[in-house]
Each structure stands twice: as C-alpha cells, then as structure tokens.
C-alpha cells in the first residue's frame, strides 16, 4: 500500500503572508506596476469576492448576473514569459500585496518540483492529488459562509508546463496524462467548493499547457522582455548612486537592448544578476 507523501515532499518553503521579506522583494520589481496591480486585483476577487459584492451592491445593484460571471471563474491564473522575465518572483511575492489589500493572512504553498515524481505508476497522480487535498483543507479553514474570507491560500506551480503539459501529445506517457487529469480535477474542486484559494501557474511555454488548463484560466498574464525605458529604470536604480551618469546609463540601455547580432534584449534577471 503506497504511503501518503509528507508536506516537505509536496511544498517548498510554505509561507504565511503578509511578510516583510516578500514585501521588499515585490517592491524591487521594476517596470511591473501594471501587472502587479492587475494580478493583485484578480487574486483579490478570486480569494475574497466579498469586497466586490459590497461594491456591486452599492454602485450597480442590478448587475448581479455579471458579478456572478466574474466571481465564478475558475480560481486559476497563468503567468507566461521568458526565463528571467520576473514572473516567478512576482508569483512568490504578490500574495503579500493581496494579504495587505484584503486584510487577511495568505498561505503560500509553492508546489515542489519533486512532486512530478519519478514516473512510477500512480505516483504523479497521488502527489498532485495530495497537494490539492492539503491546499483544499487549508483553504476550507478560511471559508466564510457569509461575508469576507478569513484568509486565503495560493497554490504556486512553477515550471507548470512540466506538470500540466498537453495531453494531445502522442509522446505523452500515460502516467503524465493521469497527472494532468488530477491537476484539472483539483482546479475544478477549488472552483466547486467556493474556497478562498487560487492556483497560480508560471510557464515559459504557454502553448505547451493542456488546452483544458488554459481554458480554465481566469486570467493569463504575458511577460515581455523589458523595454528601453524599463531597462533604464532598472539600471538607474542599481547604478545611479554609484556615479554612473546619464550618458553611461544610456550606453548600458543600448547595450542591453536588441543588437544586429542579437534580435532580443536582456531580461530582468540578465540585468540584475
């Protein structure tokens, strides 16, 4: 009889938010103000829709049907972009802003890469199911029959294309296909339970995700490489106090952008690491 995996095998560094470290990391993300605001608002509605209902009752009392359509979206958000585009850092820290915004505690559960398993029969399905079961149990503690949620859960899945890749691939192993099925069942269980929980996925291969997963996403945020203006902001924050003048910074902005021999500019991590 197979053993249930322990929490250390399922999650990497579970965190309770708000947290000063996460707040500081989020503040250091440059050029992402629009994405931070959009993601925080989407997660806030999915985790704690009571605030939106209160606003609707006050300003648009006859818009209940529209509000239900917004609130009933599956609790799944996908962040897609190149490696180093900042999506994982944002995913790991955005819960702090949501926690402060909604005035609740958020439990961040980063799904461990080891949860993919080693290919043994039934292993991946059991690991994914156990992760969702624990997240469901935690979120159920915060559920409120009436009024605002008492807390929330974010289940973070990095490198999601390795876990929820398309089942349409002819090369896909049966075990992987079963794992994707378990993943979709987990998302649907969150949605049907009306829990204060959301699945936040990061991928650099959006088209590799299973179509059923993409269809369930309440929102998909695409991360591009930083523009010249954004590169200048990053560089000036890092180097401005070190004596780099305007001409020096502009030269670095140009050097980190597209070149005749390179059809793409630097990512955020290329510049900062």
What spans do the regions from the language model cover?
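Short, flexible segments with low predicted structural confidence
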Residues: 9-11, 184-185
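Generic alpha-helical structural element
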Residues: 28, 87, 263-267
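Conserved AAA+ ATPase small/helical "lid" subdomain
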Residues: 244-273
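N-terminal accessory segments that target, anchor, or regulate ATP-driven/P-loop NTPase machines
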Residues: 1-6, 26, 89-90, 156, ...
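Charged, amphipathic alpha-helical linker segments immediately N-terminal to NTP-binding catalytic cores
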Residues: 11-50
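Compositionally biased, intrinsically disordered low-complexity regions enriched
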Residues: 1-10, 49, 54-55, 104, ...
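Short hinge/gating elements
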Residues: 19-28, 77, 220, 258-260
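Walker A/P-loop NTP-binding motif of AAA+ ATPase domains
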Residues: 34-40, 51-250
């Amino acid at each position: 009889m197979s053993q249930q995996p322990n929490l250390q095998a399922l999650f990497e560094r579970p965190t309770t938010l708000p947290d000063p470290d996460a707040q500081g990391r989020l503040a250091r993300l440059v050029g992402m103000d629009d994405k931070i605001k959009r993601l925080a608002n989407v997660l806030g509605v999915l985790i704690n829709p009571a605030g939106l209902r209160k606003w609707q009752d006050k300003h648009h009392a006859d818009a209940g049907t529209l509000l239900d359509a917004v609130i009933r979206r599956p609790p799944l958000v996908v962040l897609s972009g190149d490696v180093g585009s900042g999506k994982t850092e944002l995913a790991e820290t955005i819960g702090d802003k949501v926690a402060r915004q909604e005035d609740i505690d958020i439990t961040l559960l980063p799904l461990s890469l080891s949860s993919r398993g080693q290919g043994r029969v039934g292993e991946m399905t059991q690991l994914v199911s156990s992760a969702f079961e624990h997240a469901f149990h935690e979120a159920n503690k915060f559920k409120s029959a009436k009024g605002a949620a008492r807390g929330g859960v974010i289940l973070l899945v990095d490198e999601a294309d390795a876990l929820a890749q398309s089942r349409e691939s002819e090369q896909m192993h049966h075990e992987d296909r079963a794992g994707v099925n378990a993943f979709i069942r987990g998302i649907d269980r969150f949605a049907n339970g009306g829990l204060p929980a959301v699945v936040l996925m990061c991928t650099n291969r959006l088209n590799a995700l299973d179509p059923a997963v993409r269809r369930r996403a309440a929102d998909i945020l695409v991360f591009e490489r930083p523009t010249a203006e954004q590169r200048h902001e990053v560089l000036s924050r890092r180097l401005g106090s070190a004596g780099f003048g305007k001409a020096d910074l502009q030269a670095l902005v140009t050097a980190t952008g597209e070149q005749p021999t390179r059809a793409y500019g630097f990512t955020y991590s290329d510049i900062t690491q």
